[in-house]
């Protein structure tokens, strides 16, 4: 498992700009070739460069897993077209629910999903239908309702909010069928997704992430 530090647009909050699975990585248009090369070198996926809803905050607006990429209802037709044309090995679905920050409210891998508890049953069903996952439940992590903001889960492993209890870790591990650990990023931030991007090939962390945090992240995502 390869790990490296990264900054984007002068910030360590790299996860707000990046969505990745094991096949594709979606990022906004970035002029810095070294940044793009590092992302591709660590995550080892095809790179898709686009805005989402005219925003560079791809990681906040997009979610999914190795089978499907979920886009918010505000995604523009040309953005959807770009992703569908390039991400040919996964489904691309637009989810018509009230919230648009899908990356913050839906935490998913190919085995399960944890979803923002304030969604209506109709909205939950739309998310389940888009994901095509039977095991999708509403919940929180460490009493945080924006579950996608405080965890990163792959099909191999995951890291969640440092204050998640042992019972929470056990239940989440059973839901996602992977080993989990808790930790922080970017010198103490509990908002894991903002500072960590991971797939089965590698991990990127914000440049402020400390050595102790990196050791914990490496332990979480090690083979």
Curated annotation (Swiss-Prot):
Record Pfam families: eIF-6
Keyword Flavoprotein listed: no
One annotated GO biological process: cytosolic ribosome assembly
Molecular function terms from GO: ribosome binding; translation initiation factor activity
Annotated InterPro entries: eIF6
Protein keywords: Initiation factor, Protein biosynthesis
Coiled-coil parts of chain: none
CDD domains named among the record's database cross-references: IF6
SMART domains in the record: eIF6
Recorded family membership: Belongs to the eIF-6 family.
Protein function: Binds to the 50S ribosomal subunit and prevents its association with the 30S ribosomal subunit to form the 70S initiation complex.
PANTHER family, sorted: TRANSLATION INITIATION FACTOR 6
Name recorded for this polypeptide: Translation initiation factor 6
Organism name: Sulfolobus acidocaldarius (strain ATCC 33909 / DSM 639 / JCM 8929 / NBRC 15157 / NCIMB 11770)
GN (gene name): eif6
């Amino acid at each position: 498992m390869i790990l490296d530090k990264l900054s984007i647009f002068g910030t360590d909050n790299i996860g707000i700009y990046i969505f990745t699975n094991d096949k594709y990585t979606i990022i906004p248009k970035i002029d810095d070739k070294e940044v793009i090369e590092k992302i591709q070198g660590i995550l080892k996926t095809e790179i898709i460069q686009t805005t989402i809803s005219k925003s560079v905050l791809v990681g906040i607006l997009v979610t999914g897993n190795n089978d499907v990429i979920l886009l918010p209802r505000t995604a523009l037709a040309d953005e959807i077209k770009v992703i569908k044309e390039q991400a040919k090995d996964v489904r691309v679905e637009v989810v018509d629910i009230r919230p648009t920050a899908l990356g913050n409210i839906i935490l998913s891998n190919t085995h399960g999903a944890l979803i923002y508890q304030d969604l209506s049953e109709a909205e939950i069903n739309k998310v389940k239908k888009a994901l095509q996952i039977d095991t999708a439940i509403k919940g929180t992590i460490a009493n945080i309702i924006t579950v996608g903001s405080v965890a990163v889960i792959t099909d191999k492993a995951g890291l969640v909010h440092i204050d998640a209890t042992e019972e929470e870790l056990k239940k989440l591990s059973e839901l996602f069928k992977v080993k989990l650990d808790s930790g922080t990023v970017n010198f103490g931030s509990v908002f894991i997704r903002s500072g960590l991007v991971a797939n089965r090939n590698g991990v990127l962390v914000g440049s402020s992430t400390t050595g102790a945090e990196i050791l914990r992240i490496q332990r979480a995502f090690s083979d």
